[in-house]
Amino acid sequence: MPSNARAGNLKDPEVAELFFKDDPEKLFADLREIGHGSFGAVYFARDIRNNEVVAIKKMSYSGKQSNEKWQDIIKEVKFLQKLRHPNTIEYKGCYLREHTAWLVMEYCLGSASDLLEVHKKPLQEMEIAAITHGALQGLAYLHNHNMIHRDVKAGNILLTEPGLVKLGDFGSASIMAPANSFVGTPYWMAPEVILAMDEGQYDGKVDVWSLGITSIELAERKPPLFNMNAMSALYHIAQNESPVLQSNHWSEYFRNFVDSCLQKIPQDRPTSDMLLKHRFLQRERPQTVIMELIQRTKDAVRELDNLQYRKMKKILFQDTQNGPNTETTEEEEEAEQFLHCTGTITSMESSQSVPSMSISASSQSSSVNSLADASDDSGEMAMMQEGEHTVTSNSSVIHRLPAHDNIYDDPYQPEMEAQQSSSAARRRAYCRNRDHFATIRTASLVTRQIQEHEQDSALREQMSGYKRMRRQHQKQLMALENKLKSELDEHQQRLDKELEAHRSNFSAENEKISKKHQAIFEKEAKGGMTEEKKFQQHILGQQKKELTNLLESQKRQYKIRKEQLKEELQENQSTPKREKQEWLLRQKESMQHYQAEEEANLLRRQRQYFELQCRQYKRKMLLARHNLDQDLLREELNKKQTQRDLECAMLLRQHECTQELEFRHLQLLQHTRSELIRMQHQTELGNQLEYNKRREQELRQKHAAEVRQQPKSLKSKELQIKRQFQDTCKIQTRQYKALRNHLLETTPKSEHKSILKRLKDEQTRKLAILAEQYDHSINEMLSTQALRLDETQEAEYQELRIQLQKELELLNAYQSKIKIHTDAQHERELKELEQRVSIRRALLEQRIEEEMLALQTERSERIRSLLERQAREIEAFDSESMRLGFSNMALTGIPAEAFNQGYQAPPPGWPSRPVPRSGSHWSHGVQNTGAPQLWRQPTLLAPPSASWGLHPPGSSSSLSALPSSSSSSSSSPSSSSGGRPGLLLLRNSPQPLRRGGSGGPSEAGLSRSTSVTSQLSNGSHLSYS
């Protein structure tokens, strides 16, 4: 049935055949509610067709989560229909009426937990073995049919009148094994069920764990950790060691049986079939063990109910003159004597029990509480008013007939004393059908169960909400995994279509590339000629500007130097005027001669530089044409391998795309899982904090009640002290009178007056002392009682705080463990995916390498012939340059004149047409380093190392040093830069054209002859546009 079907919809034939069409209200009579649970209510009923007593479990599927409730009903009905075994509850049918399912099952006396509730003591080892053996046989039947119960506990192990043990409450069962849902009752859950969503699936061995916990429950009256919050118990079970039997009086067989069931690792835990052969179950025991236990329990229940009934009867009809305290005390003594006679325990349970929260009524029936308390009286009165005693255990029913026998006369009928004959007739009718309503539960137990169900609705709703959240998280993860899988399949289909479409476009692309190449070749040729002219004009303009700047600079320097010389002559007054003029004339001639020589040198260097740059430019153009030829050949060769190259590149790209999608899917899945775990942890923490708050509030309410009750207690103690002092005063008064009479009798009458006065003073003094003692006793009692109450309440509060803090720390440790496990799982999944992707990538690269090697031989031969031809052309050009006077170094390196020459850099938009169009080209085999790229580099010109000779006549400096320095600098680039702190950079010099593809060592080599795999491994392919 689809999970999204409307609740109660019977249009699906498979669902409709699960339910009978009859009206259940017409088939079953005498319905009486005998239990209540989170699923609904359990009723006793009688089938009017055959007078058979049955149990009816009513489950509503309206309101909140109606679809989920409906699915749970369908699942339970399907499960019960499959059961055919003596140790499982018998299913009789299911009916629908007004959004409520009536699940009819066989009637049982009660559950194993009822035995503990009635007797208030653990079962004997022989009885535990018998009950466990029967339950294990039922579990073995389920497990052999790939079914899991998932809620095994004493409250779900039922007993019948013939002494059979049956499994009940299959609302949590799973038809398929393994399973991965978070279901069950917390205290009995196996660790793998608690960690179901985090670690994966589990099988029927979870029932073996629950059976081990149930064995401890039968041996110790409650399961381990039962005094702990249910949520805290989950965290404790998940991360701590397995529980063991506390007492040492149990046999070694029993202890070994429990230890075997509670193996923490599921693989180490035996199966149900293996456990059936355990020595603990195979030991000899009487066949009537369970029968005797049931009979003993029924007798105890009957007598306890009689005592409770007589107690209520006397309370209602006691005479006014008789004090109620006396009657109550007598009844309590009578009950106590009976319990001692039957071997039961009458002490009240001091520990507060927390009912386990399952979807069945047995979850509440397994809580450990006292037999009779004051809160049960009102419930029992109401039940007796209805004329019945009702009990329940899980989906089976345990009943009490209407109280019409000799001990259940209706206390609310005043005329009952006068109607003995009618009562006797009812008692005889009841006794005839007594066996149909036998039970092993007391009325007070049923009442308390209903009260606990109402009081603990918050806890039950919290746990059910937590289970519902865990199931929703699992469904969400499964839906996400299915969605990602379908998305990956669609992605693969889309890639296949893309590859086919790309292959069909290869022929059209080849034709377009050929036409585009021809247009580029023509454009390169025209552009090269235009740029050569612009290049020459640019150099000439820069040289002219440099010459003008030099002439203007010489004029300025000449004037400055002339003024300096005149000042020097004026300072030297001792020199004759004629000598001064001759010396001045010589300085002027020397300066003019130096400037003329400097101008001639500049013109010579400019001419050399211009010729060299033009020759270099032509060589660059030749290299650019060679590169273009290489592009032509490359295009021609690529016509044969373009399809293969692009196909391989596309395969690699598709591989990368698929890899990226897989990693993204894994990241999304892990992020979703982490987010769900974070939400789960927040919910767990919120539940724990809410539980802590509720416990503290309950303690505060208890303390407030104690504080309110304290004045009454203090008043009673004060009255007690007052009575003690009154008695003391009376004694002293009697003693005073006796002493007075004695003295008056033994002394003369004349001394009587003085004696009376002395006795009166003595009496007054003693009474004053007694009054002081009374006041002191009262004050001491008040202060002691107040201090004792404060200390007691503070101790209780601190004890509660410590307990709650431990539970919170347990939760934090559990959540940390889950987070560490999740992170490790995510890391493991990531490594596995990386390994799969790496293997797939290696296989793809191997195939591409084999395909590319087949084309490489032909390609290498064509390239070799082209490179030989281009090398011959370069050699011829270089030979012509040598004939014209240009060295090979001058054409391929930085010219010597460039170190003394400064030109302005061309504008930013200056094109460099000789630059090859492609980024990678073949080398010619001719070494060609080329000039460095200097046009676009801002440079600085170092200041001249020689001054203009501003020294007076007779100094060691002379102007002749300047031209020699300049000359040496122009003749050797290395000498010009060797004596300076750093390499002399050029300022305003035109940048030589950058080298072509064959221009230097950095570009040497064959781009297509390099490893094809190294280029394709990065997911790239060559661009031929």
Swiss-Prot record:
First and last residue of the signal peptide: none
Catalytic residues in the record: D151
Record's protein name: Serine/threonine-protein kinase TAO2
Catalytic reaction(s) noted: L-seryl-[protein] + ATP = O-phospho-L-seryl-[protein] + ADP + H(+); L-threonyl-[protein] + ATP = O-phospho-L-threonyl-[protein] + ADP + H(+)
Coiled coil, from the record: 457-650, 755-876
Compositional bias ranges of the Pro residues kind: 905-914
Similarity comment text for this entry: Belongs to the protein kinase superfamily. STE Ser/Thr protein kinase family. STE20 subfamily.
Residues annotated for ATP binding in this entry: I34, G35, H36, G37, S38, F39, G40, A41, V42, K57
GO cellular component: cytoplasm
Biased composition (Polar residues): 1007-1025
Necessary cofactors: Mg(2+)
InterPro entries attached to this UniProt entry: Kinase-like_dom_sf, Prot_kinase_dom, Protein_kinase_ATP_BS, Ser/Thr_kinase_AS, TAO_STE20_kinase
Gene Ontology annotations of biological process type: DNA damage response; mitotic G2 DNA damage checkpoint signaling; positive regulation of JNK cascade; positive regulation of stress-activated MAPK cascade; stress-activated MAPK cascade
Residue intervals of the Protein kinase domain: 28-281
EC number: 2.7.11.1
The species this protein was found in: Xenopus laevis (African clawed frog)
Molecular function GO terms recorded: ATP binding; protein serine kinase activity; protein serine/threonine kinase activity
Function: Serine/threonine-protein kinase involved in different processes such as apoptotic morphological changes, MAPK8/JNK and MAPK14/p38 MAPK signaling pathway. Activates the JNK MAP kinase pathway.
Region called Disordered, residue ranges: 349-377, 899-930, 945-1025
UniProt keyword terms in alphabetical order: ATP-binding, Coiled coil, Kinase, Magnesium, Nucleotide-binding, Serine/threonine-protein kinase, Transferase
Pfam families: Pkinase
Sequence ranges of Low complexity compositional bias: 349-373, 947-986
Gene, per the UniProt record: taok2
